[in-house]
Regions:
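Mid-chain, structured segments of secreted extracytoplasmic proteins
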Residues: 63-107
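Core segments of cupin and vicinal oxygen chelate
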Residues: 31-71
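Vicinal oxygen chelate
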Residues: 35-37, 90-137
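Bacterial Sec-dependent N-terminal signal peptides
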Residues: 1-22
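Exposed loop/turn and edge beta-strand positions of beta-sandwich/beta-sheet ligand-binding modules
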Residues: 58, 86, 127-128
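N-terminal beta-strand motif that seeds the catalytic metal site of vicinal oxygen chelate
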Residues: 17-37, 88-92
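Short beta->alpha transition motifs characteristic of CBS
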Residues: 124, 144-147
Length: 147
C-alpha cells in the first residue's frame, strides 16, 4: 500500500502534460498608421476592404475585415516610427486579380514584382500571379491571384 502513491506519482509524471493540442486561428493584423483617415481611405478604395465596428471603442483605432473572420486593425494612437522592409508584409488573395490590377493602374498606384520592377506582375512557379504595393505609411502588401 505504501507504494501506491509512488506508483500513481510515477504514472502522472510519465504522462505528457502537453498532450492536448492548442488550436489557433488567425484573427487579425494590426498596423500603426500616422494618418488614420488617409489610411482608411486607402484600404477602402484601393483594397476594397469593408470597415467593421471597432469593438474596443478606443478613439484612433479602426477595424476592417478581409473576409472569413480575418481583420486588419489600423492604430493611430502610437506615435513611434516603425521600421519597414519588404519581408515584413501581409498578403491577400483575390479571384479578381486582373480587375485589381486595373484598379491600381486607374488610380496610378505603383506596384511591383518581388525584385522591385515597377508595374510588373510576378508569376510564381505554381502559376499564382502576385504584386507588391505599399500603403500610405509604407507597409508592404502582397496581392495574389487564386489558382
Amino acid at each position: 500500500m505504501k507504494f501506491l502513491p509512488i506508483l500513481f506519482l510515477m504514472i502522472a509524471l510519465n504522462s505528457p502534460i502537453y498532450a492536448q493540442k492548442l488550436n489557433f486561428s488567425f484573427n487579425h493584423v494590426a498596423i500603426s498608421v500616422t494618418d488614420l483617415e488617409r489610411s482608411c481611405t486607402f484600404y477602402k478604395e484601393v483594397l476594397k476592404l469593408e470597415e467593421i465596428t471597432n469593438k474596443t471603442k478606443v478613439e484612433g483605432i479602426r477595424w476592417f475585415t478581409t473576409g472569413n473572420g480575418i481583420e486588419l486593425h489600423l492604430i493611430s494612437t502610437i506615435k513611434e516610427r516603425v521600421k519597414i522592409n519588404k519581408a515584413v508584409h501581409f498578403a491577400l488573395s483575390t479571384k479578381d486579380f486582373d480587375k485589381f490590377i486595373q484598379n491600381l493602374d486607374g488610380k496610378k498606384i505603383p506596384y511591383s514584382d518581388w525584385p522591385g520592377t515597377p508595374q510588373k506582375i510576378n508569376v510564381r512557379a505554381d502559376g499564382i500571379r502576385q504584386v507588391f504595393l505599399q500603403d500610405p505609411d509604407g507597409y508592404w502588401i502582397e496581392v495574389n491571384s487564386v489558382s
